[in-house]
């Protein structure tokens, strides 16, 4: 990130970053998915850091991705898939609890709207 920092110890580097208003936070991510038009890049057990530099947040992902064609159902707990509009049980429960409706009604509305927030808003 900073050129010529080979001689700095990590503590000194952190102190300098704090002086410049840069906060660095480790995120305990289990999986990171990057979706492009053609494929999904799935990082299992990736190292993720959040850098906040004066309000601008940047995420850094380090790891080996597995490439999947878009639309493969490799991950069971995706919040939604593009073709089927399938949602995880957690998503259905969240909508049902927030809107005060049954899970079947929540699932139908999720499939209809394709979005958690829109489903809750429609049901309220």
UniProtKB/Swiss-Prot annotation:
Annotated stretches, region: Disordered: 53-124
Domain called NAC-A/B: residue spans: 7-74
InterPro entries registered for this protein in UniProt: NAC_A/B_dom_sf (IPR038187), NAC_arc (IPR005231), Nas_poly-pep-assoc_cplx_dom (IPR002715)
Keyword Protein transport in annotation: yes
Compositionally biased intervals (Acidic residues): 74-93
UniProt-recorded Gene Ontology molecular function terms: RNA binding
Keywords: Protein transport, RNA-binding, Transport
GO biological process: protein transport
Recorded family membership: Belongs to the NAC-alpha family.
Known function: Contacts the emerging nascent chain on the ribosome.
Assembly and binders: Homodimer. Interacts with the ribosome. Binds ribosomal RNA.
HAMAP family (UniProt xref): NAC_arch
Identification of the protein by name: Nascent polypeptide-associated complex protein
């Amino acid at each position: 990130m900073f050129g010529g920092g080979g001689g700095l110890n990590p503590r000194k580097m952190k102190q300098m970053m704090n002086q410049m208003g840069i906060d660095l936070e480790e995120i305990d991510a289990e999986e990171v998915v990057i979706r492009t038009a053609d494929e999904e890049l799935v990082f299992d057990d990736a190292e993720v850091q959040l850098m906040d530099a004066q309000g601008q947040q940047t995420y850094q992902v380090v790891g080996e991705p597995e490439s999947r064609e878009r639309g493969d159902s490799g991950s069971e707990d995706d919040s939604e898939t593009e073709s089927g509009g399938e949602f995880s049980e957690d998503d259905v429960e969240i909508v049902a609890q927030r809107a005060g409706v049954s899970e079947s009604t929540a699932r139908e509305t999720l499939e209809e709207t394709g979005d958690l927030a829109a489903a809750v808003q429609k049901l309220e």
